[in-house]
UniProtKB/Swiss-Prot annotation:
GO cellular component, one term: cytoplasm
Catalytic reaction annotation: Hydrolyzes single-stranded DNA or mismatched double-stranded DNA and polynucleotides, releasing free uracil
Record-annotated active site: D67
Compartment(s) where it occurs, according to its Swiss-Prot or TrEMBL record: Cytoplasm
Protein name from the UniProt record: Uracil-DNA glycosylase 2
Taxonomic source organism: Streptomyces coelicolor (strain ATCC BAA-471 / A3(2) / M145)
SMART domains, per database record: UDG, UreE_C
Record-linked Gene3D superfamilies: Uracil-DNA glycosylase-like domain
Length: 227
């Protein structure tokens, strides 16, 4: 249950110790009990999909989300992203609108953000599982301790990164990041509740300027249409 093999290989050295912590064992027992009682998203094999898609040494940007999508077949373990064929959710629609206004990138027909992850954008939710139909149902069960360890691991690397903290929840993680070494892009959350402040904040330009300043290839934010 807490075998190190559950983690993608590139993350094992920096996160393996977390799996031995009492909180993590309790967390895994809780998630298994939840799965025994009904649907939990994402499926087991996609819980660590964000870490799988963006290896530790390739992280250029870390975008912090909150909670997985709680609808059937929506999420696949990357924050803000949905599977091909799933309707683009409101927050991601607003991200696309800002991207289009800022960079003139076409608004895609899908919400599958794997092209970002493959370029080094770690799309990390603070909580990695959720009960079907119940947002925040796995909050404060231990996932936050684990994902704080992910943030700290990236922040401890010699190679600097860009941390994207949208909204008050994400910005509570600021103490985990040394702003003298890394760049933090802060702003309003793209949710419809705060989108007015999000629009015009030009996060994608800020991120790419920082990425280039750190000596890395900027991110191509274009998401291809899947038809």
């Amino acid at each position: 249950m807490t075998d190190i093999a559950m983690l993608p290989e590139s993350w094992r050295e920096v996160l393996g110790g977390e799996l031995q912590q009492p909180y993590f064992k309790e967390l895994m027992e809780f998630v298994e009990e939840e799965r025994a009682n009904g649907p939990v998203y994402p499926p087991r094999e996609e819980v660590f999909a964000a870490l799988d898609a963006t290896p530790f040494d390739r992280v250029k940007v870390l975008v912090l989300g909150q909670d997985p999508y709680h609808g059937e077949g929506q999420g696949h373990g990357l924050c803000f992203s949905v599977r091909p064929g799933v309707k683009v959710p409101p927050s991601l629609r607003n991200i696309y609108k800002e991207m289009h206004a800022e960079l003139d990138t076409p608004i895609p027909d899908n919400g599958y953000l794997m092209p970002w992850a493959e370029q080094g954008v770690l799309l990390l939710n603070a909580v990695l599982t959720v009960r079907a139909g119940e947002a925040n149902s796995h909050k404060s069960r231990g996932w936050e301790l684990f994902t704080d360890a992910v943030i700290r691991a990236v922040a401890a690397r010699t190679d600097p990164a860009v941390f994207v903290l949208w909204g008050n929840y994400a910005q509570k993680k600021l103490p985990l990041i040394d702003e003298a070494r890394h760049v933090v892009v802060k702003g309003a959350h793209p949710s419809p509740l705060s989108a007015k402040k999000f629009f015009g904040s030009r996060p994608f330009t800020q991120i790419n300027e920082a990425v280039a300043g750190q000596g890395h290839e900027p991110i191509d934010w274009t998401i291809p249409n899947l038809g």
